[in-house]
Amino acid sequence: MVQQAESSEAESNLPRDALDTEEGEFMACSPVALDESDPDWCKTASGHIKRPMNAFMVWSKIERRKIMEQSPDMHNAEISKRLGKRWKMLKDSEKIPFIREAERLRLKHMADYPDYKYRPRKKPKTDPAAKPSAGQSPDKSAAGAKAAKGPGKKCAKLKAPAGKAGAGKAAQPGDCAAGKAAKCVFLDDDDEDDDEDDELQLRPKPDADDDDDEPAHSHLLPPPTQQQPPQLLRRYSVAKVPASPTLSSAAESPEGASLYDEVRAGGRLYYSFKNITKQQPPPAPPALSPASSRCVSTSSSSGSSSGSGAEDADDLMFDLSLNFSQGAHSACEQPLGAGAAGNLSLSLVDKDLDSFSEGSLGSHFEFPDYCTPELSEMIAGDWLEANFSDLVFTY
């Protein structure tokens, strides 16, 4: 009541002409002024207490009546749209009487309904089980929701260490810090005492995890005494070519023989130099290198044994990468003294193989020169005709 008196004094301090013009019309048209004598002026038929109107609601109620009188067929949504635009266009000075009336209604509402508390309707949730009943108070519904979330938090807390333990077998010991960060424990005040023992049991132990991870990896690898000897690891390195250029030294070299035996003893099938030279042709002159003794090289030129040792060694390694295809084996079975036609065809094959081996060592875009004499002659010829009239087409 004291606040109402203060508001009335504030109204009396305003200019009298302002009260006579807008506020007089406002009080005359105000629907609330007629019903304020009723003690249930803000209650609905079902007993629900309505909220006090704000300034826009007070103004829109008056203006809505005017619009409905002028155009009764206008839709309610269209009226609301127009009223919203007009309210935004109003000046602050024009809104003052409606703001004052809304404040007066708010104070009267507080005096008539002191126990009123604004409780907006909660939107229905998608999960019907989590939806509280309509008659339940907000405090009880909040407590029920809190109790419903409790088991879910415990389950999440139990799942996190289980998932970490399953992933610990594949993870390295250095990943233990990441596993710790993945564990999130949310505890309510009433669950802290109950969950202390569980948390102590589920808390990750860095030392134990490191010790557990090592045996998990140890069954995959043999112990240090059972690991592969260093000589068996040499099978992954490139096989050495004997340094001596003679055939006799290649067969008599103890180092080369021991290397090839270790390769065959490794338990996997590897082509050794003994398999290469198994089908040797009749003894060649001593000036031939070991790579020259292979059949493709011997057939490349009939009787000519010239060629550097480095190029022959590269050809030998290329033959290893080809895995001795059937064509190479058929070429090996030909005698050294074959006809000129056979030597010519094998020499062409040898040139193609050498060009492929050289191209594989470089870039994919380095193409060898395959120009034949006829092609080079065509390229070198005159491209422009001497007589320009020959280039003119006649139809």
Curated annotation (Swiss-Prot):
It comes from Mus musculus (Mouse). Disruption phenotype: Mice die at birth with numerous morphological abnormalities. Incomplete separation of the heart ventricles with fused aorta and pulmonary arteries. Skeletal malformations including hypoplastic sternebrae, unfused vertebral bodies and hypomineralized skull. All mice have microphthalmia and open eyelids, with 50% of mice exhibiting omphalocele, and 40% exhibiting cleft palate, cleft lips and a tail kink. Sox11 and Sox4 double knockout mice die in utero at 10.5 dpc. It comes from the Eukaryota. Its main location: nucleus. Keywords: Activator, Developmental protein, Differentiation, DNA-binding, Neurogenesis, Nucleus, Transcription, Transcription regulation. Expression prominent in the periventricular cells of the central nervous system, also observed in a wide range of tissues involved in epithelial-mesenchymal interactions. This is Transcription factor SOX-11. It is found in: Nucleus. The keyword Membrane does not apply. Coiled coil: none annotated. Residues 1-11 have a biased composition (Polar residues). The keyword Oxidoreductase does not apply. One of its GO terms (biological process) is positive regulation of stem cell proliferation. Transcription factor that acts as a transcriptional activator. Binds cooperatively with POU3F2/BRN2 or POU3F1/OCT6 to gene promoters, which enhances transcriptional activation. Acts as a transcriptional activator of TEAD2 by binding to its gene promoter and first intron. Plays a redundant role with SOX4 and SOX12 in cell survival of developing tissues such as the neural tube, branchial arches and somites, thereby contributing to organogenesis. GO terms for molecular function: cis-regulatory region sequence-specific DNA binding; DNA binding; DNA-binding transcription activator activity, RNA polymerase II-specific; DNA-binding transcription factor activity; DNA-binding transcription factor activity, RNA polymerase II-specific; RNA polymerase II cis-regulatory region sequence-specific DNA binding; transcription cis-regulatory region binding. Residues 158-174, 289-309 have a biased composition (Low complexity). Residues 363-395 are annotated as: Required for transcriptional activation activity and synergistic coactivation of transcriptional activity with POU3F2. Residues 49-117 bind DNA.
